[in-house]
Amino acid sequence: MRSRRGLLIVLSGPSGVGKGTVRKELFSHEDTRFQYSISVTTRKPREGEVDGVDYFFKEREEFEEMIRNEKLLEWAEFVGNYYGTPIDYVEKTLQEGKDVFLEIEVQGAIQVKKAFPEGVFIFLAPPSLSELKNRIVGRGTETEDVIENRLTVAKEEIDMMDAYDYVVENDQVELACERIKAIVVGEHCRRERVAKYYKEMTEGL
């Protein structure tokens, strides 16, 4: 049984925890029907990232115009770059009964929760801070100063997990995906999500 309006599913966590890897693995599963909401960012593309697939890559001036025109559900500045979520796309997709999947930074997730408290907020946690550092170093794209900055921010973000509905440890990507899928199935069956549909159905009898 599924609720008729789509769910807004927000996956968030520290930089380097593997949000992108988990999201790509989830979307490779045939039994998932998520609609990925592509974020807008001003950071430079990493190797293998494609504009319009992984992110919409914008210049700072373009992003700031979107802020002024209130075209973003949320936005945040993280390590010198902007990140944001286009609002019109999200609401339209939810109304169509599709689940919208957001993979965003922690600051952005907190903003989204204020605007969409009925969303499903999942904090992706690392097995340990040492493992998180290994993953960031393994990218080979960050300077030592940036790595240390990201770890400092990560500690602050882990302290913010109380704002989330669920915490999923990313010890193994496949296991993390199965946990997230189980969360979504359960959320679709929550009484408060399906009650309105059945109330309308019985009123028509």
Swiss-Prot record:
It is an enzyme of class 2 (transferase). One of its GO terms (molecular function) is guanylate kinase activity. Its EC number is 2.7.4.8. Pfam families: Guanylate_kin (PF00625). Keywords: ATP-binding, Cytoplasm, Kinase, Nucleotide-binding, Transferase. The keyword Transferase applies. The keyword ATP-binding applies. InterPro entries: GK/Ca_channel_bsu, Guanylate_kin-like_dom, Guanylate_kinase, Guanylate_kinase_CS, P-loop_NTPase. PROSITE patterns: GUANYLATE_KINASE_1 (PS00856), GUANYLATE_KINASE_2 (PS50052). Residues 6-185 form the Guanylate kinase-like domain. SUPFAM superfamilies: P-loop containing nucleoside triphosphate hydrolases. It is found in: Cytoplasm. It catalyses: GMP + ATP = GDP + ADP. ATP binds at residues 13-20. One of its GO terms (cellular component) is cytosol. Belongs to the guanylate kinase family. Essential for recycling GMP and indirectly, cGMP. NCBIfam families: guanyl_kin. This is Guanylate kinase. It comes from Bacillus anthracis. The lineage of its organism: Bacteria, Bacillati, Bacillota, Bacilli, Bacillales.
